UniProtKB/Swiss-Prot annotation:
Gene name, Swiss-Prot/TrEMBL: fxn
Transit peptide start-stop: 1-72
GO BP terms, alphabetized: heme biosynthetic process; intracellular iron ion homeostasis; iron ion transport; iron-sulfur cluster assembly
Catalytic reaction list: 4 Fe(2+) + O2 + 4 H(+) = 4 Fe(3+) + 2 H2O
Lineage: Eukaryota, Amoebozoa, Evosea, Eumycetozoa, Dictyostelia
Biological role stated in the UniProt entry: Promotes the biosynthesis of heme as well as the assembly and repair of iron-sulfur clusters by delivering Fe(2+) to proteins involved in these pathways. May play a role in the protection against iron-catalyzed oxidative stress through its ability to catalyze the oxidation of Fe(2+) to Fe(3+). May be able to store large amounts of the metal in the form of a ferrihydrite mineral by oligomerization.
Mitochondrion found in the keyword field: yes
Compartment(s): Mitochondrion
Protein name per UniProt: Frataxin, mitochondrial
Pfam family, one: Frataxin_Cyay
């Protein structure tokens, strides 16, 4: 990640911009002018496209700092992308196999009408009858698991290498815990993964 501090002094307020970017050495800079436009500058100082990035704007007034805005931040410091693609596939495939094993038990129990589990090519589809469909798939370029749920909507999960589990990259909820909870809500089946 690239870290860059920009300073701009005005009459009484000193503004600092702390910027994080993980996209090919691009740095997103807030043009602190009256227009407040965003521009993106690469290492050659040439204008390029704006990329989604983690932004923290901190304003200092009389030596007191106040956080104004924060967006799209990963809250868990243990989640770093798995660099080895083969290791990533092994970890995700093992997780999906566990899900399929546990969910097939639910399917065989016939406690949830219309319940089906399908898994192939890195995509796990869980059909919960007329209540909706889950799609859980691996995203190799991002080294993430992506989730689409009829209850909680879309989510992205990063691998926590310390806890050895997948966690939501926004709120830190473990993937297994979320799946257990939602299957329990939809199917009234107490599943433990």
């Amino acid at each position: 990640m690239i870290f860059n501090f920009l300073n701009k002094a005005s009459n009484k307020t000193h503004t600092k911009l702390l910027l994080f970017s993980s996209i090919r050495n691009r740095i997103l800079i807030n043009n602190i002018s009256s227009t407040s436009k965003w521009s993106s500058i690469n290492n050659n100082n040439k204008q390029s496209s704006v990329s989604k990035t983690n932004i923290f704007i901190i304003t200092t007034h009389n030596k007191q700092q106040q956080q104004l805005s924060k967006s799209f931040s990963t809250i868990n410091n243990n989640t770093k992308p798995i660099s080895d693609v083969n290791l990533f596939h092994d970890i995700v495939d093992e997780e999906f196999e566990l899900f399929v094993d546990r969910l097939e038990i639910l399917s065989e129990a016939n406690t949830c009408e219309g319940f089906e589990v399908e898994g192939n090519d890195g995509v796990l589809t869980i059909i919960v009858g007329n209540k909706g469909t889950y799609v859980i798939n691996k995203q190799t370029p991002n080294r993430q698991i992506w989730w689409s749920s009829p209850l909680s909507g879309p989510k992205r999960f990063d691998y926590d290498s310390v806890e050895k589990r997948w966690v939501d990259n926004r709120d830190g909820t473990p993937l297994r815990q979320l799946l257990n909870s939602e299957i329990n809500t939809l199917c009234k089946y107490d599943m433990e993964i």
